[in-house]
Amino acid sequence: MRNDVLTLTNPMEEKELEQILGGGNGVLKTISHECNMNTWQFLFTCC
């Protein structure tokens, strides 16, 4: 169990931090990043 705790508390690497904060190669790719607002409005208001 001690090893599990140590694994969970390991600090992030610089590359991981840059990716999360939007530095380096850019932001994380997500569905909402790829789509525009009109698509989401249609999906949530169509019913």
Swiss-Prot record:
GO terms assigned for molecular function: signaling receptor binding
One Pfam family here: L_biotic_typeA
Crosslinked positions (Lanthionine (Ser-Cys)): 32-46
GO annotations of cellular component type: extracellular region
PTM characteristics: Maturation of lantibiotics involves the enzymatic conversion of Thr, and Ser into dehydrated AA and the formation of thioether bonds with cysteine. This is followed by membrane translocation and cleavage of the modified precursor. It is not established whether the 2,3-didehydrobutyrine is the E- or Z-isomer.
Reported function: Lanthionine-containing peptide antibiotic (lantibiotic) active on Gram-positive bacteria. The bactericidal activity of lantibiotics is based on depolarization of energized bacterial cytoplasmic membranes, initiated by the formation of aqueous transmembrane pores. Ruminococcin A is a broad spectrum bacteriocin exhibiting activity against a wide range of pathogenic clostridia and B.longum.
2,3-didehydrobutyrine PTM sites in chain numbering: 30, 39
InterPro entries: Lantibiotic_typ-A_Lactobact
Protein name (Swiss-Prot/TrEMBL): Ruminococcin-A
Localisation per UniProt entry: Secreted
Induction info: By trypsin.
Cross-link position per record: Beta-methyllanthionine (Thr-Cys): 30-35, 45-47
Major subcellular location class: secreted
Protein keywords: Antibiotic, Antimicrobial, Bacteriocin, Lantibiotic, Secreted, Signal, Thioether bond
Organism: Mediterraneibacter gnavus (Ruminococcus gnavus)
GO biological process: defense response to Gram-positive bacterium; killing of cells of another organism; positive regulation of biosynthetic process of antibacterial peptides active against Gram-positive bacteria
Signal peptide annotation: 1-23
Family assignment from sequence similarity: Belongs to the type A lantibiotic family.
